C-alpha cells in the first residue's frame, strides 16, 4: 500500500524550542511524525536582554554578559534536542535567532525565520502557565498565525503518545468550507498507510438567549449541513487508501460550545492529532475568531494543527 497522499505534502518542519520541559515534549512528539526525506529545522530564539533589564548608564557589560548566557543556554538546549533525533534519517539543521540583532519580539523572529526557510509547519510546545505559550497569547498568536505563512502545530505540555512510530489516529474538524478542506489536505501529510482518519462535524445545540429561530429547526439545519460537509470530505479520505470514519458531534444543550465539544470528542476517540482550518464557517470559525492559537492552546488536550486558508 502506498503512503497517504496529500495536495500539500509535509516536507519541512520547523521546531521552536526553549529550555522548558514543554519544548522537550514537543520535540519527542515531532520525532514520531518525521519520515525519511523530511527536513527539520530546530530554532531557539532568545530575547533581547535590553528589553528585560533597566536602561541605566554603564549597563553594556551587563547586557553583553546576559546575552552570552542566553546564547550558551540556547546552544545547550539545541544540543539536547538534536540528540533526540539521532538515527531519524531526516536532514536536520538548527539555528539560534537573537532578537537583539533581528529586532522585534521572539514571535517576530520565529515567524521570519520560519517563512524564510519555507517551513510547511511550525511546532510549538504549549503550557498554560509558562514557556513558549507566551508566543500564542494575544497579539503574539497573530504574528505566528499570519506571518509564518505555514501551519502551526501546538503540542500540550501534558500530552504523551502511548507509542512511537507513525500516527495511528488522525482527526479532522470539518465544516464543508474550502479552508476546512484545505486543512484536510495539509493534515493528510502526516498520515501513514495504517493511520485511521476521522472527519468530525460539530452541531451546536447550545441554547442562547439571542436565538430567534426554533432550536430544533437550527439543529436540523446544522445536521443537514454537517452531512453535506462530511460528504464533501469523503472522497479526499478514501483516496488515501487508509481506513476512515466520519461522524457528527453534538454540543450539550446548555453551557457548552463547539470548541469544548470537539476537544472532548478528540480525547474520547484518542486522537493523536486534531487538524483544524482557521478560516471556516459558523462553529469552527466562531472558535477561531480572535486570538486563534491562545484559544486552542488553553483547551487542547491533544496536539492541534492549525492550518491557514489558502491565500491568507
Regions of interest found by a model, annotated:
Residues 35-116, 120:
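Ordered, small/hydrophobic-rich secondary-structure cores
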Residues 41-43, 93-98, 153, 198, ...:
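General small-molecule cofactor/ligand-binding pocket signal
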Amino acid at each position: 500500500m502506498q503512503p497517504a497522499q496529500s495536495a500539500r505534502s509535509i516536507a519541512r518542519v520547523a521546531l521552536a524550542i526553549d529550555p522548558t520541559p514543554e519544548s522537550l515534549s514537543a520535540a519527542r512528539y515531532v520525532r514520531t511524525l518525521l519520515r525519511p526525506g523530511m527536513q527539520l529545522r530546530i530554532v531557539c530564539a532568545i530575547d533581547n536582554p535590553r528589553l528585560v533589564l533597566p536602561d541605566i548608564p554603564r549597563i553594556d557589560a551587563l547586557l553583553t554578559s546576559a546575552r552570552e548566557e542566553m546564547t550558551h543556554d540556547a546552544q545547550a538546549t539545541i544540543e539536547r534536542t538534536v540528540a533526540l533525533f539521532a538515527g531519524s534519517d531526516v536532514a536536520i539543521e538548527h539555528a539560534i535567532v537573537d532578537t537583539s540583532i533581528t529586532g522585534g519580539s521572539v514571535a517576530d523572529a520565529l515567524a521570519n525565520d520560519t517563512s524564510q526557510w519555507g517551513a510547511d509547519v511550525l511546532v510549538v510546545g504549549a503550557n498554560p502557565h509558562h514557556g513558549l505559550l507566551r508566543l500564542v497569547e494575544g497579539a503574539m498568536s497573530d504574528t505566528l498565525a499570519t506571518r509564518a505563512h505555514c501551519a502551526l502545530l501546538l503540542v500540550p505540555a501534558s500530552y504523551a503518545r502511548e507509542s512511537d512510530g507513525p500516527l495511528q489516529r488522525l482527526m479532522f474538524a470539518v465544516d464543508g468550507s474550502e479552508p476546512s478542506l484545505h486543512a484536510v489536505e495539509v493534515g493528510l501529510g502526516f498520515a501513514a498507510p495504517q493511520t485511521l482518519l476521522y472527519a468530525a462535524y460539530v452541531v451546536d445545540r447550545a441554547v442562547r438567549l439571542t436565538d430567534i429561530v426554533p432550536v430544533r429547526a437550527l439543529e436540523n439545519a446544522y445536521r443537514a449541513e454537517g452531512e453535506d460537509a462530511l460528504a464533501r470530505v469523503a472522497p479526499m479520505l478514501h483516496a488515501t487508501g487508509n481506513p476512515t470514519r466520519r461522524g457528527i458531534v453534538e454540543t450539550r444543550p446548555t453551557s457548552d460550545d463547539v470548541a469544548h465539544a470537539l476537544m472532548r470528542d478528540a480525547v474520547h476517540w484518542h486522537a493523536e492529532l486534531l487538524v483544524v482550518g482557521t478560516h471556516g464557517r459558523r462553529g469552527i470559525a466562531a472558535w477561531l475568531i480572535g486570538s486563534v492559537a491562545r484559544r486552542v492552546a488553553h483547551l487542547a488536550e491533544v496536539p492541534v494543527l492549525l492550518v491557514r486558508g489558502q491565500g491568507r
